[in-house]
Amino acid sequence: MSYNYVVTAQKPTAVNGCVTGHFTSAEDINLLIAKNTRLEIYVVTAEGLRPVKEVGMYGKIAVMELFRPKGESKDLLFILTAKYNACILEYKQSGESIDIITRAHGNVQDRIGRPSETGIIGIIDPECRMIGLRLYDGLFKVIPLDRDNKELKAFNIRLEELHVIDVKFLYGCQAPTICFVYQDPQGRHVKTYEVSLREKEFNKGPWKQENVEAEASMVIAVPEPFGGAIIIGQESITYHNGDKYLAIAPPIIKQSTIVCHNRVDPNGSRYLLGDMEGRLFMLLLEKEEQMDGTVTLKDLRVELLGETSIAECLTYLDNGVVFVGSRLGDSQPVKLNVDSNEQGSYVVAMETFTNLGPIVDMCVVDLERQGQGQLVTCSGAFKEGSLRIIRNGIGIHEHASIDLPGIKGLWPLRSDPNRETDDTLVLSFVGQTRVLMLNGEEVEETELMGFVDDQQTFFCGNVAHQQLIQITSASVRLVSQEPKALVSEWKEPRAKNISVASCNSSQVVVAVGRALYYLQIHPQELRQISHTEMEHEVACLDVTPLGDSNGLSPLCAIGLWTDISARILKLPSFELLHKEMLGGEIIPRSILMTTFESSHYLLCALGDGALFYFGLNIETGLLSDRKKVTLGTQPTVLRTFRSLSTTNVFACSDRPTVIYSSNHKLVFSNVNLKEVNYMCPLNSDGYPDSLALANTSTLTIGTMNEIQKLHIRTVPIYESPRKICYQEVSQCFGVLSTRIEVQDTSGGTTALRPSASTQALSSSVSSSKLFSSSAAPHETSFGEEVEVHNLLIIDQHTFEVLHAHQFLQNEYALSLVSCKLGKDPNTYFIVGTAMVYPEEAEPKQGRIVVFQYSGGKLQTVAEKEVKGAVYSMVEFNGKLLASINSTVRLYEWTTEKELRTECNHYNNIMALYLKTKGDFILVGDLMRSVLLLAYKPMEGNFEEIARDFNPNWMSAVEILDDDNFLGAENAFNLFVCQKDSAATTDEERQHLQEVGLFHLGEFVNVFCHGSLVMQNLGETSTPTQGSVLLGTVNGMIGLVTSLSESWYNLLLDMQNRLNKVIKSVGKIEHSFWRSFHTERKTEPATGFIDGDLIESFLDISRPKMQEVVANLQYDDGSGMKREATADDLIKVVEELTRIH
């Protein structure tokens, strides 16, 4: 068997649908966004969109509509999933807790029926009498809406018109009436039917219209007073209501296809339209009032408002704000202005919602050489195309930096007690202290009266009674604010030097070697309260007040040399409350008591970058739940700071980290800076909510990005990226991309817009000796769109496009690899292409081109003609392995720098994907699942080892280990095949057994080995083997890792128990959602653990946790089974969350 754990590292980001209404209350305006399996609920405020709740559905959201039946005070939500689970949801809030209640649910799948090519359509009658669904050709399904019905029951009505393009319910009809566009051999037509609930039949509708535009694709039902429907086509927009027929053909809409629409006004006088090029239009219905007071339509008008992201859906929010939901680019709320700007646009983007989808390809690289992978994806399409650099951690935006080597500490000050913001920064150096005055964004050096500047400062700050304090190696100095003067000074009785110190607003603890002294701060006086001797020298200490102790800390935390211990002492007596031996040789360098999400912790960092953290009881001073993580390799300094009103800790070291709490568990996120030795929070007029950071040579002031798990940087390329690879020697990425050009009158083509391939620093064009340009059998016509393919060379540091190489006309670049070949010392970019002509069923010729990029120049080293499309290429034992149509071929690289065929394997339909390990080759086929080949170096040929005989239409493949192979197929499933080495007969051995099945609910485009987290983080006891990342069409990034059998069994048990405790939204069974499902078969999931479900354990209440662990057997590593506690499982799950 094979045991795997699959989990989401980045939730889907592509927006598939959006609606607006009054869901959370009658007064709120809500925006609901569907991102595949996730539903996000926002409330529209004057400041912008405020997130209320995010709901994970057990299904892909196919239909999402708000409606309000009679007797309801606010809107209800109807959702239908791709596996035909229907539910009606209601928002309930009591105090802090928010629940999404399932009012009614049911599955509306038919046992037979052909799913419609135009997808699932779900509509609701405006009077809320019924829900209509078009799921299968020739059938219209009706769900009657009864208030009391807990179960959604549906019936089918036969529809003679098999090929329905779009359907809507009309407004203002006595009986529910549908209006639809359908296609038959004669063309496209519009028809209406009344739906009779009693007879469960269609009755003749009020009107119909034969032979509308051949490309008519959308129906918009218009509310009263107009009524009727608008039909939108490629070139024309028409209005019908039985009496009135009006058609317009504005040239402006011809360039592209309109794909979405949304009503602006309740009376239907204005509609927003969005097209495939990202243009936003307004459709206006002009009215005419008749003598008898009725209103009829006078005219239709279309106006271009401007350009947005390419819209998948549009919804009008309020006050001229429209939400543009995008699948191919970032989504954005946009403001519609009355007047146009200089570019003639009426649209302004207000903010952007990052979308990684569709992830077409990706690679993992460690650019910073820090042992941490970054994921670089080819994301988006057309003008929304971009590269996304995704790393685990937090970004800091630099606002100012000053060259100041040797900083040993820094603190913010308010020089005037009445100020709200900091205006001074105190910097400490060996043997001296300097003071910087902040004036707006200007920084100048100054002197503070009462402060000494010829000694190193250990602490400095504003303290009680409007005073300042400076602790230096010689003394503790209390300075009055008005006037600035020294009012009290404490020195060690024998005038010894202070070694470490800590201070809060009214308490000071200093250490002099082994001696500890406790002082209190009074008006104009430092009062020594107590002192004690420890058995070893004090290495670090802290007196941060926790809880509601009025700024006084009853505890003091210290770390000692020699015995390497952390201790909690009681103040003022210095009585020992708890002693924790840390073990090892390395001394504690920094200790900190802090509170995250109302839980108290003690953090203790050692000189080698290790960090211990404990739960701290502030009443007793006892430590519990000892845990250890490795943050860096250098001594670590811990400092607290606040961000968005929550406390976080910054760990300064060679790998700076922010420690924060999420769902009552600590999260360690690294920061995108090389090293930080010291930091302090800074909130000045010129630099609000900032951080001051010092490394060996520089002082930097910056602000921190929103604290979250992943940091995403966008590099727009404004065309479609297809493939990416990294080349270390040239410090570049190679990217295959394609831009759209339009045939002009002269027979040439022109680009639609500037993009990466037209804006590169240098460029070149293929001229092939293999194909003469006149060989093109295909003539394009005026106005036709053609794809132009390029290889882009992109700098790994600046992401500048250094070079763009354009391929031949009709030549599609399909595969890309960077590698060395044979004994040749050079590293090459190699591109596989196909010549694509519309009249050919599959490509008959293509080429493999070998490029070398060095010294800023791209040279073509070799090219090889092939008889087909080069779908995939990998470097294989110093040779080049390629799949060409149905053939897998191995090329060797000769001394003459030519590719020579060594051997072939022919038994495929279409070999799309190749992965290798050692001498093994995994081939992913278009429709025949996966195949395992072995290369025999002695014979110089391929041997077919085994294949999966199930028909799977593959979208990506990966080798997990020597015996297990991962596949993703086009019905959103994952599966694992296993080589059966122990089989007795040859026939059994030739079968790859499907040992893992799982419904991911995402279309996977790419798998790659790698991880987004530091590889040595924490002493983990959860053995996960390997890490494969996956990228999907919806911008979701997932991770698959292998488990041992015992861990799999524990997690499977836990998964089953969680399913009993966690109630799913829409009452969809988890086992139904995750079952492997294709048109051919449905089988229960096996061999996979649903990591998202396991991780949800951390979000449930303590009593529910107890319910899950009741009688659960658990082996804590001692080999003995015992009953698990909730804390055992919390530890296990927390460790699992750290793998992504």
UniProtKB/Swiss-Prot annotation:
Region (WD repeat beta-propeller A): 13-356
UniProt-annotated location(s): Cytoplasm; Nucleus
Annotated pathway: Protein modification; protein ubiquitination
Residues recorded as bearing N-acetylserine in the entry: 2
Record GO biological process: apoptotic process; biological process involved in interaction with symbiont; cellular response to UV; DNA damage response; DNA repair; ectopic germ cell programmed cell death; epigenetic programming in the zygotic pronuclei; negative regulation of apoptotic process
Quaternary organization: Component of the UV-DDB complex which includes DDB1 and DDB2; the heterodimer dimerizes to give rise to a heterotetramer when bound to damaged DNA. The UV-DDB complex interacts with monoubiquitinated histone H2A and binds to XPC via the DDB2 subunit. Component of numerous DCX (DDB1-CUL4-X-box) E3 ubiquitin-protein ligase complexes which consist of a core of DDB1, CUL4A or CUL4B and RBX1. DDB1 may recruit specific substrate targeting subunits to the DCX complex.
Family, similarity comment: Belongs to the DDB1 family.
Annotated function: Protein, which is both involved in DNA repair and protein ubiquitination, as part of the UV-DDB complex and DCX (DDB1-CUL4-X-box) complexes, respectively. Core component of the UV-DDB complex (UV-damaged DNA-binding protein complex), a complex that recognizes UV-induced DNA damage and recruit proteins of the nucleotide excision repair pathway (the NER pathway) to initiate DNA repair. The UV-DDB complex preferentially binds to cyclobutane pyrimidine dimers (CPD), 6-4 photoproducts (6-4 PP), apurinic sites and short mismatches.
PANTHER family: DNA REPAIR/RNA PROCESSING CPSF FAMILY (PTHR10644)
Protein name: DNA damage-binding protein 1
Originating species: Rattus norvegicus
